[in-house]
Amino acid sequence: SALSGRKGHIAYATTKGAVVQMTRCMALDCASDGIRINAVCPGATDTAMPMSKHSAPISRERLLENCRQSIPLQRIADPEEVVRSILFLASEDSSYVTGTTLSVDGGTTA
């Protein structure tokens, strides 16, 4: 929601977009102290959250299939995939990365 719009989600998308800008500004503010600031924007992930967004009854399988069809990689992320991206940004392997927003979304925002 931070990197793309969606009808009926103005408040949610606005707050997510603010996190992207906050990440950039904080990265600049903290760089001289050797502190790196980055953000991760996960796409559809196999958690309970997508089910909680729907007021109409829908089966988990149907919801996941609907999501899969809109994702270029044609699958939902496993939570561990999102965790690994966060661990990468927290590690020394990304020591020259700051102020970035990493999309972990199967190509949805490509």
Language model: regions and residue ranges:
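Active-site "substrate specificity/gating" loop of NAD(P)-dependent dehydrogenases
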Residues: L3-H9, A31
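C-terminal substrate-recognition "lid" of short-chain dehydrogenase/reductases
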Residues: R75-V104, T109
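Active-site segment of SDR-like NAD(P)-dependent oxidoreductases
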Residues: S1-S4, M26
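Conserved SDR Rossmann-fold cofactor-binding beta-strand/turn motif
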Residues: R36-D46, A90, S103-D105
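A glycine/serine/threonine-rich, flexible loop-to-helix segment
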Residues: A44-S70
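Active-site helix of classical SDR
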Residues: T15, T23
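Alpha-helical segment proximal to the catalytic Tyr-Lys
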Residues: L28-S32, S95
